[in-house]
């Protein structure tokens, strides 16, 4: 993984298997770069390109925090989880607090 396109491919491959919030995917990409066996300056370039990759994925609707959070809230509610548990879960996944409160008011 030495190019930005490789990072995009990895992100799309990850998203084809798992749903993810923007912040969680950012963490996943940083961990992937950290584990790769490339020079430090190449890693630095890839780290700097993460916002661009995330923006591209958002633009093409591969990641959408609202859809992700809504889906997770509905799943957790159907599993009988409490509102406090769900809010804590969304907080851990770094979903914006305004967004999570909006989802709860819609339900």
Q: Where are the predicted features?
A:
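An alpha-helical, amphipathic repeat domain used for nucleic-acid recognition
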Residues: 1-107
């Amino acid at each position: 993984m030495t190019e930005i396109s490789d990072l995009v491919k990895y992100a799309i491959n990850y998203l084809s298997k798992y749903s993810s919030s923007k912040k969680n995917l950012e963490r996943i990409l940083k961990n992937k770069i950290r584990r790769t066996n490339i020079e430090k300056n190449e890693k630095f370039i890839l780290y700097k390109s993460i916002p661009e990759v995330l923006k591209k994925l958002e633009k093409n609707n591969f990641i959408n925090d609202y859809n992700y959070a809504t889906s997770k809230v509905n799943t957790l509610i159907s599993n009988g989880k409490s509102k406090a548990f769900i809010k804590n879960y969304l907080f851990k996944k770094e979903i914006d607090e305004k967004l999570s409160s909006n989802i709860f008011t819609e339900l």
